[in-house]
Amino acid sequence: MDRFLDAAIAEAEKGRADGGIPIGSVLVIGDEIAGRGHNQRIQRGSVVLHAEMDCLENAGRLSASVYRNATIYSTLSPCSMCTGAILLYGIPQVVVGENRTFQGPQHLLEQAGIDVKVLDDPRCISMMTSFIAENPELWNEDIGE
């Protein structure tokens, strides 16, 4: 098991327990978690608080050199907005729990030379599959459909 993916899953579960969309993210620098977050669009009535955005916000202000040595983990493939933040800050590695229930613009990350690893983690797949089946309206709103 990957302890950083486990931490992202714990964030996703926290979001689900709070009535939100179960997507979690952690920002890793070296061997330490610098930021954690989960999707809070529902809980906070936000249009931008996806898991990766919440994670980056919770990491606080970091220098460009720090981001360029970081890895961001997400339980789900980053959307266009979150991909843009990853590109903006030059985060060189993205680890994705799963991209079966939603595939963001992974090709944009790869074209920019970012190392993208998709783990196809069954826990992430199950969490999202269940949520989407139970809450299709919330899910469609989250992905802009």
Predicted regions and their residues:
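Zinc-dependent deaminase
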Residues: 1-15, 87-145
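A short helix-loop-beta-strand connector motif used in the catalytic cores of GNAT acetyltransferases and
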Residues: 17-21
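Short beta-strand scaffold segments in enzyme catalytic cores
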Residues: 23-31
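Short beta->alpha transition motifs characteristic of CBS
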Residues: 34-41
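Glycine/small-residue-rich phosphate/adenosyl-binding loop
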Residues: 35, 52-61
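A short, polar/charged loop-to-alpha-helix boundary motif
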Residues: 41-53
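Short helix-loop-beta connector
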Residues: 65-69
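Local cysteine-cluster metal-coordination motifs and their immediate loop/turn environment
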Residues: 73-92
